[in-house]
Amino acid sequence: MTIAIGSTYQEKRTWFDDADDWLRQDRFVFVGWSGLLLFPCAYFALGGWFTGTTFVTSWYTHGLATSYLEGCNFLTAAVSTPANSMAHSLLFLWGPEAQGDFTRWCQLGGLWTFVALHGSFGLIGFMLRQFEIARSVNLRPYNAIAFSAPIAVFVSVFLIYPLGQSGWFFAPSFGVAAIFRFILFFQGFHNWTLNPFHMMGVAGVLGAALLCAIHGATVENTLFEDGDGANTFRAFNPTQAEETYSMVTANRFWSQIFGVAFSNKRWLHFFMLLVPVTGLWMSAIGVVGLALNLRAYDFVSQEIRAAEDPEFETFYTKNILLNEGIRAWMAAQDQPHERLVFPEEVLPRGNAL
């Protein structure tokens, strides 16, 4: 048997190894494998949105002016959804609708599908970026897991909901006032505010804001700095690197306030992670239900009684009336291509039915 002394086995490097080294090397802005998805998609999504809000009209899809060029401002400009007749077409520039004509593609609403799809994959790339960097510095992946919540909301609202409806037309347009209109649409056609999944989402977001405020205030309240001086205001020095707040003092404070308090930082911060993420995921699940036109909390008995007894009215029946008004006014305004004409007898009256 022959033994080679002084030689070591070295695996042959491939192009993949070279690419891996370049993508993951330490630089000011980390690229990584996730960057191959994140950076192009984010660039195209933002570029498409800025292009649409600056130059592109929605006259051919919604009968609206939605660009700076037409006189809109930041709050009223938008990249609008495609025409209802486009259904669920991906509206590729080279597809049968636009046939390579960029102007026609913009007129049909192609920029909306462009922004929505690149935006979705850009968000997913950002989550993968958090996984990748956490892996490289030996951290747990909770940041990426938390970021799955806003991704779930984006995908459910902008993609899954219109997929359950007749077309992309019923998704939100990408603009501030456009999102407000979509919220009113959700209320009028789905009674969204009374949906338990929406309630859980509100509880999660507002509860997280409350937890964030309480946590920040408590840490500031219990800051200390080593020393014998009576004046502890120096503890607010923002450049001090060490952890300088007292968990014991915070625990005692909230035990006196509420009677209960978090006993360790791990459970406290996990709870601060759990509340908003769970809330956003629940709201995303609720929107998936709306995509299928599922309804929740229709108190029909109150509606029937309100119809029979003009003196009986609840906040629920008043809201049902408001929803009817939203539908009656919005449907004709929002879907002019349907040429809807509502006779007087179907417009909202003075009771729930």
From Swiss-Prot:
Instruction: Detail which positions bind chlorophyll a ChlzD2.
Output: 118
UniProt: a plastoquinone binding residues: 215, 262
Look at the named UniProt entry and state the broad enzyme category this protein falls under: oxidoreductase
Q: Membrane-spanning regions, if any?
A: 41-61, 125-141, 153-166, 208-228, 279-295
The entry marks the following residues as binding pheophytin a, namely 130, 143
Q: Which residues carry this modification: Phosphothreonine?
A: 2
Q: How does it sit in the membrane?
A: Multi-pass membrane protein
Q: Does the keyword Transmembrane helix apply?
A: yes
Which GO biological process entries does UniProt record here? photosynthetic electron transport in photosystem II
Listed EC numbers: 1.10.3.9
The note on the cofactor says:
The D1/D2 heterodimer binds P680, chlorophylls that are the primary electron donor of PSII, and subsequent electron acceptors. It shares a non-heme iron and each subunit binds pheophytin, quinone, additional chlorophylls, carotenoids and lipids. There is also a Cl(-1) ion associated with D1 and D2, which is required for oxygen evolution. The PSII complex binds additional chlorophylls, carotenoids and specific lipids.
Any Pfam family matching the protein: Photo_RC
Q: Where in the cell is it found?
A: Plastid, Chloroplast thylakoid membrane
Quaternary structure, from the entry: PSII is composed of 1 copy each of membrane proteins PsbA, PsbB, PsbC, PsbD, PsbE, PsbF, PsbH, PsbI, PsbJ, PsbK, PsbL, PsbM, PsbT, PsbX, PsbY, PsbZ, Psb30/Ycf12, at least 3 peripheral proteins of the oxygen-evolving complex and a large number of cofactors. It forms dimeric complexes.
The family line of this record is: Belongs to the reaction center PufL/M/PsbA/D family.
The role this protein plays is: Photosystem II (PSII) is a light-driven water:plastoquinone oxidoreductase that uses light energy to abstract electrons from H(2)O, generating O(2) and a proton gradient subsequently used for ATP formation. It consists of a core antenna complex that captures photons, and an electron transfer chain that converts photonic excitation into a charge separation. The D1/D2 (PsbA/PsbD) reaction center heterodimer binds P680, the primary electron donor of PSII as well as several subsequent electron acceptors. D2 is needed for assembly of a stable PSII complex.
Which protein are we looking at? Photosystem II D2 protein
Q: Which organism is it from?
A: Tetradesmus obliquus
Q: Which gene encodes it?
A: psbD
